[in-house]
């Protein structure tokens, strides 16, 4: 039985009061949108969302993804009514050390499924979670996977380019488990939305294959009706376009309406406007941080309903476990967060192959041995060699999620965020590929994954100017330096925010993939070559790659000079060693696939590989700064300082100085400087 509409409106006003008061107390934040969206949040949280208050991480729960993170006061207030936050927590909004930061940060124990703020990404995460739920349902059945994924978006998210990718993919896959509320209040931070957009959003989503329902987003009955219809939808994702009022219930200092005003979007109501608003909504400005008694009742009632719903679901789950012990064991393993078990001896590598081809060999084994892994590509599977995975499975398509390859189309950012969302859902391991130069499209997703500590795998191929004939638009130069900065940035757990690997040959690629799959704490970036790379000298202990940098076999004792690189430049350094040794120069070659891992080793180990006072020469196909931290103050780096050029890659090697002969020449000159 549904709650009385008067009480529901009172509850929405309670959320409005709390949201406005949080912003007012912090003297910082966004009250207007939060006040406008309170009706939907209240209906969803008090009557529809299925979760276990006593077990917030229950795998069978519905998931709610907020996209406009600036509307955090609405989320925190709604979660406070559910018992996840105290009034003291709300009072500490945006303060040091509080559990209520300005934009929500992933916190499953308090009901927050995703960090949000950069507009557009939140609903892409939700779409990814919806794919994961369908993928797992195909393997485990509907008893264990029957939940819904709810997303909440704003005008800003619709304007963001990523909404195109999410709209297309979710519609194409028929994600009927995805229900998205579009808070359409026609106001944004600096203008009314009509200044920058005049499209028919309803028709746009219908064209993508969505079920679109348009309602008054502040009307309880219409919200219920829309949610009922969305839950019954069998073939399409649903977009509920709720026309809401920015700053609903707000009054100015003079007592006139402050609704639908740009000013309420991103600043406290302030002074008498705040006082008038709280009184108008039925609160006490002197004691605003309270939950009304009748509101407590409806949420207590929902908690009791949920006990019954969850008990029935968990009983059914227990029966399923008895009937399906092997699947149950798999499910527990998949949701454990532990690294999957892989027999890496099954990987067969071909000496001299491109590391992208070596990656394909690893992916083929992963496709066979990790049944909960999803691999994706942005329309490049036959080039980035994620087809090594695809050849052992099939693509995920509408109506059939038994495959494990996610075809994203040309949408790198959408693909990345959806893969992150798959992992946020839980139960899956996600990896995705594209050209390294197009990692630029993905940077916002890399950052949000790093912030949330989601161990997704980024596969970036065609790693340098050796892309060749395609020319500078497709030849990464600055990209490696950019992503390696993320190795230096720490997450809130004190770990390197992203683990980065650029292996030197096929066998080192296997070790790097092993390390990537074992890394369950942070995202991993794997950077691979387009062209074949000579095998490192016989006897090289590839397992040492786990230390980030290590001495390659055949290196001399007490070297006069140390040569260091990652990727294909290691073999280029090796090519210059013979001539250097013929001149009586003792040489050590160091492969450094991961500077971040290397910096995490003991000072003694670091000193044993790259002594501080040694003469160190580095070679990188990227910017010199990529290696300057490793060569140190006495070192020298040969790198690119311009964009690349269009020509066969062997011609570019000659023209740009990436040959054994130039290594000899540059090292001799470097040593002569002493």
What are these regions (language model features)?
Residues 278-309:
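Non-catalytic, alpha-helical, charged scaffold/linker segments
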Residues 151-152, 180, 376, 617:
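Residue-level marker for buried hydrophobic side chains located in beta-strands
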Residues 156-162:
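Short acidic, Gly/Ser-rich segments with clustered Asp/Glu that frequently serve as metal-coordination loops
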Residues 1-148, 297, 301-527, 532-534, ...:
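Thiamine diphosphate
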Residues 67, 154-155, 218, 411, ...:
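Structured loop/turn residues at secondary-structure junctions
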Residues 5, 65, 156, 191-192, ...:
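A generic secondary-structure micro-motif detector
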């Amino acid at each position: 039985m549904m709650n009385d509409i008067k009480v529901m409106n009172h509850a929405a006003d309670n959320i409005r009061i709390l949201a406005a008061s949080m912003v007012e107390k912090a003297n910082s934040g966004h009250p207007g949108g939060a006040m406008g969206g309170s009706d939907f949040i209240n209906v969803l949280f008090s009557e529809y969302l299925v979760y276990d208050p006593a077990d917030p991480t229950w795998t069978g729960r519905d998931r709610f993804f907020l996209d406009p993170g600036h509307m955090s006061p609405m989320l925190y207030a709604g979660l406070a009514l559910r018992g996840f936050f105290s009034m003291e927590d709300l009072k500490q909004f945006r303060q040091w050390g509080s559990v209520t930061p300005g934009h929500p940060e992933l916190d499953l124990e308090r009901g927050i499924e995703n960090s949000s703020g950069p507009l557009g990404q939140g609903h892409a995460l939700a779409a990814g979670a919806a794919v994961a739920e369908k993928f797992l349902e195909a393997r485990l059945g509907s008893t264990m996977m029957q939940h819904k994924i709810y997303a909440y978006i704003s005008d800003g998210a619709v304007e963001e380019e990523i909404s195109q990718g999410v709209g297309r993919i979710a519609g194409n896959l028929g994600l009927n488990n995805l229900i998205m509320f579009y808070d359409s209040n026609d106001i944004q931070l600096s203008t009314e939305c009509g200044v920058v957009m005049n499209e028919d959003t309803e028709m746009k989503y219908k064209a993508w294959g969505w079920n679109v329902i348009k309602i008054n987003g502040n009307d309880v009955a219409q919200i219920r009706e829309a949610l009922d219809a969305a839950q019954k939808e069998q073939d399409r994702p649903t977009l509920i376009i709720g026309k809401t009022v920015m700053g609903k219930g707000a009054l100015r200092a003079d007592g006139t309406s402050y609704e639908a005003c740009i000013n309420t979007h991103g600043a406290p109501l302030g002074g008498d406007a705040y006082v008038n608003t709280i009184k108008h909504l039925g609160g006490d400005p002197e004691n605003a941080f309270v939950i009304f008694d009748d509101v407590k009742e409806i949420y207590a009632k929902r908690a009791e309903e949920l006990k019954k719903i969850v008990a029935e679901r968990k009983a059914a789950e227990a029966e399923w476990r008895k009937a399906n012990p092997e699947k149950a064991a798999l499910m527990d393993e998949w949701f454990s967060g532990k690294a999957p078990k892989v027999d890496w001896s099954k990987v067969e590598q071909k000496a001299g192959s491109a590391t992208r081809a070596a990656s394909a060999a690893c992916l083929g084994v992963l496709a066979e041995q990790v049944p909960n892994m999803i691999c994706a590509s942005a329309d490049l599977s036959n080039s980035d060699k994620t087809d090594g995975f695809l050849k052992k499975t099939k693509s995920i398509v509408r109506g059939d999620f038994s495959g494990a390859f996610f075809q994203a189309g040309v949408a790198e950012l959408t693909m990345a965020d959806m893969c992150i969302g798959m992992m946020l859902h839980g139960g899956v391991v996600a990896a995705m590929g594209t050209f390294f130069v197009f990692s630029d499209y993905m940077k916002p997703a890399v950052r949000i994954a790093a912030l949330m500590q989601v161990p997704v795998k980024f596969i970036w191929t065609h790693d340098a100017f050796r892309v060749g004939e395609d020319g500078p638009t497709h030849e990464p130069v600055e990209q490696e330096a950019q992503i390696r900065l993320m190795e230096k940035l720490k997450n809130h757990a004190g770990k390197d925010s992203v683990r980065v690997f650029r292996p030197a040959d096929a066998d080192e690629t296997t070790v790097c993939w092993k390390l990537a799959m074992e890394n369950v704490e942070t995202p991993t970036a794997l950077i691979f070559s387009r062209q074949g790379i000579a095998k490192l000298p016989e006897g090289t202990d590839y397992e040492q790659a786990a230390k980030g940098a290590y001495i390659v076999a055949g290196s001399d004792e007490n070297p006069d000079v140390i040569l260091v690189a990652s990727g294909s430049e290691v073999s280029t350094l090796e090519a210059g060693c013979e001539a250097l040794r013929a001149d009586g120069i003792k040489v050590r070659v160091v492969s450094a696939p991961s500077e971040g891992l290397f910096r995490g080793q003991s000072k003694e180990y670091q000193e044993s590989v790259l002594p501080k006072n040694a003469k160190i020469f580095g070679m990188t196909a990227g910017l010199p700064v990529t290696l300057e931290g490793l060569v140190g103050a006495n070192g020298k780096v040969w790198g690119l300082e311009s964009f690349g050029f269009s020509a066969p890659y062997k011609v570019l090697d000659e023209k740009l100085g990436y040959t054994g002969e130039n290594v000899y020449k540059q090292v001799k000159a470097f040593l002569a400087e002493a």
